[in-house]
Amino acid sequence: ETGITYTQVAQYCVLIFAYLVPAIFVSILMTSNPNPALGFGDTLTDSSVYLLDKLDQISIDLGFGAYTEFKKSTIDIFCITAALMVGTAGLPHVIVRFFTVPSIKDARKSAGYALLFITILYLTAPAVAAFARVNLVESIQDKSYETTPAWFKNWEEIGLIAWQDKNGDNKITYASGDAFVPAKPVFDNSSDGHPRHITNKPHKLTDNEVYIDRDIVVLASPEIANLPGWVIALVAAGVLAAALSK
């Protein structure tokens, strides 16, 4: 039991560092605030504009609506919060704490620590998403394929990003709505330095030309922010630790 506990502690240490270190890096770069949860509501380093205000403007320009706009009813918020609380309490990482410690007191303490560190992850998640959205749009919007960052082509090569020039202007347009029909792209060749050919039909009712798999937001965030290679490697190690902890 002690061995299992220390193994889980080691896995979580790798996971939390892999998640927080890139978030702290990006928060410092964008807001000069080392705390991602606080940097989320701080001003940008290159201007006096608040990050949330910029995110609102970007979201509106792309057709998504203001990021901070309150759209849900009170009952919706209550149900979402209740689901999050019950789901967190039922996480295997929390429940297992009651079977790997010798006493009830230790079980309560262990579960308390588990919930504390899970809370840190939850508080950081919105900041990671906000940072990634801003950096993503600024790095690809209205850019030609040839001038897109290396990360765009790397993720395209494995099929998690796709682009199709709908309007023939040779520039990337990222907007709301699906880019293709069906939404998930199907490729028929490798990129070879050019956009991979997509067999899907373009979605005629939207201006969006880009497909980005939502599962890569956390993974690609360090690359999008142009962080050092060791940070990207740390994220990969964290993903492996998360997979092994299930």
Locate the predicted segments by residue.
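Membrane-water interface regions at transmembrane-helix termini and the short interhelical loops
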Residues: 1-12, 94-104, 240, 244
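Gly/Ser/Thr-rich helix-start
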Residues: 88, 130, 239-242, 246
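Loop-to-helix junctions at membrane interfaces in multi-pass transport proteins
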Residues: 13-233
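Non-catalytic terminal/interface segments that mediate subunit docking, oligomerization
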Residues: 234-238
